[in-house]
């Protein structure tokens, strides 16, 4: 399978619900690096992660390079997408243990042999952790308007019940991940569940604003399959 037929394969399997403009052209241009994030908020993968792992394996078989991001940083906050109430915050000891467990499980599903499709497994604590609040607000936060953030479905669903600034800011952290990976790992593709669409498009918008061009692409599996 080639990158160019990846969309056909995933579409045939009913795994694409939404995708960004230009994705088809980017896949046709040559091999692509794509990522999915797994927050370290639990000790194990669950059945909801199955199709995300499935997407990564299909990407690798198509000649692309999977990039797995363990959310050691974002897992300390918790993604509000699809949640009716705020998660309990975990301490660093629990996050570290969860990260190690997720790494061990994910290594079973992909081929880590040397080569152009060899997966990368990263932890976003490595780049988000050292960033100060002032640096984050200056370099990332200034590119997001409050109306833009409020319009996200994950935010709208929680406004009436109350939402902390911690959870409200989650989309900017995930966007910062996409920007970092785009710059340092050559990642142009982010994949995720239907509930991640707002976070994915936030990353695309950040890349567009910071890099000064509409670059990057993402695909999303069907919500009905998740």
Where in this protein do the model-derived segments appear?
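NTP-dependent nucleotidyl-transfer catalytic core
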Residues: 1-225
């Amino acid at each position: 399978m080639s990158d160019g037929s990846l969309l056909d394969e995933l579409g045939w399997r009913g795994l694409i619900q939404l995708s960004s403009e230009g994705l088809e052209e980017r896949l046709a241009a040559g091999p692509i690096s794509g990522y999915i994030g797994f927050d370290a908020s639990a000790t194990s993968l669950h059945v909801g992660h199955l199709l995300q792992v499935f997407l990564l394996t299909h990407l690798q078989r198509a000649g692309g390079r999977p990039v797995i991001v363990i959310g050691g940083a974002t897992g300390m906050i918790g993604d509000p997408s699809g949640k009716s109430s705020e998660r309990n915050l975990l301490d660093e000891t629990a996050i570290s243990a969860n990260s190690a467990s997720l790494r061990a499980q994910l290594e079973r599903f992909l081929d880590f042999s040397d080569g152009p499709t060899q997966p990368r497994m990263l932890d976003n604590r490595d780049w988000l952790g050292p960033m100060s609040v002032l640096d984050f607000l200056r370099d990332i936060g200034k590119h997001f308007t409050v109306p833009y953030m409020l319009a996200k479905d994950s935010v709208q669903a929680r406004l009436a019940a109350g939402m902390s600034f911690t959870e409200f800011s989650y989309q900017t952290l995930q966007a910062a991940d996409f920007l970092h990976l785009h710059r340092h790992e050559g990642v142009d593709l982010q994949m995720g569940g239907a509930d991640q669409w707002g976070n994915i498009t936030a990353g695309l918008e950040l890349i567009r604003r910071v890099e000064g061009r509409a670059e990057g692409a993402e695909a999303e599996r069907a919500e009905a399959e998740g």
